[in-house]
Amino acid sequence: MRLASLAFLSLVLACAPHDPLGSPAPAPVADGEWTAYGKDVFGSRHSGLTQIDTSNVARLQVAWTYHTGELPPQVQTRGRRSLEATPIVVDGTMYLITPLGRVIALDPETGRERWVHDARIDRTIGFGDHTSRGVSTWLDPSRAVGQPCRRRIVAATVDARLLSIDAATGRLGEDFGVRGTVDLRVGLRNRPFETSEYEETSPPVVVNGVIVVGSAVADNQQIDGASGEVRAFDVRTGALRWTWHPVPQDPADPAYATWRGPNAHRTGAANAWSVLAADPARDLVFVPTGSAAPDYYGGERLGDNRYANSITALRASTGKLVWSFQTVHHDVWDYDNASPPALVTVAYGGRRRDAVLQATKTGQLFVLDRETGAPIVPVTEMPVPRSTVPGEE
């Protein structure tokens, strides 16, 4: 087992540009808008607004409060509940999703409710976590102002449904999937036995006409737990466009050899439960994957287990692998790549480079070339002691 490590981190941060990080999107996001979980599909998390600064931040007061009404005793559920949503703001409306799958549109200036779409999550099911980190949006250039679903709100629910909602009315788009919904449990390599073993807790990323979605898979349940495919669906129709397996299934894939014996065909997880990023101009989507099943024992999945615990670039239009960089080999520590990738431009070695930044649970920050996955900042592989657990290596 080996752990990849990073050198010269402080130098990268010192050399990072002070202007907004990330390449400009094809359609720049206005400063007053926040169109994705991380501001934009690049995950830049930068706002150019200047009204609040060091001279007045201490005098800020609450302007309004909105109550979702989902705390006990008003609502009872099985399992934990937490509001983790980052709202998006687009076209003068704020959109968010609650732990129980209620998508809400608010006036961002007053907090007045404009509409609510209730996905009607079964509250008797003990999901691992009742949570959702946000929603995504897409503007259909083929539809005129005032037409239904000109702008869509895309949401993935904890019970693994993909919803396409008219941003103006809160109604499901009837031309998407089955009456506005795609069942994400259909078509999995390892289908979960229980609903709570396969969930959606992060917003999908919408790029170049497709909705790309990962999944949250129950940890430490069984070797052949729910599989962690990353899939893309047509943003208009909901039709499946492609599937990528983070546990490789094709013997011709070079990564297949890093799973010894029959392990690749039965092992689950290695899923991407965090938020994805995208570079529309390069037709790339960046996928941070987690550990394979089970998390803390690798005797049933010997080898480096490549594509698990990786940051992987896929062609957004086809799902084809472009490159993959593994941050931990043969993970037995649950070192998922839990942070969303950030697409930035860094100054290093006397020149500016378009990069992907991936922060990890180990406290390391990997700085990779956006087109090749090669480390921009040198990475040193450090040997660690061999395991003494029976069956491990």
Language-model-derived ranges and their functions:
Residues 1-9:
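Sec-dependent signal peptide recognition
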Residues 13-14:
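C-terminal motif of bacterial Sec signal peptides marking the signal peptidase cleavage site
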Residues 19-65, 246-253:
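Blade/loop signatures of beta-propeller domains
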Residues 29-34, 41-42, 64, 68-71, ...:
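Acidic, proline/glycine-rich low-complexity intrinsically disordered segments
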Residues 34-38, 79-100, 127-161, 196-222, ...:
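Repeat-blade elements of multi-bladed beta-propeller folds
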Residues 35, 41-47, 70-75, 96, ...:
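Short, solvent-exposed loop/turn elements at domain surfaces
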Residues 44-56, 74-83, 257-261:
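Short, polar loop/linker segments at the starts of domains and inter-domain junctions
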Residues 55-71, 103-125, 139-146, 162-195, ...:
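Extracytoplasmic/lumenal domain signature
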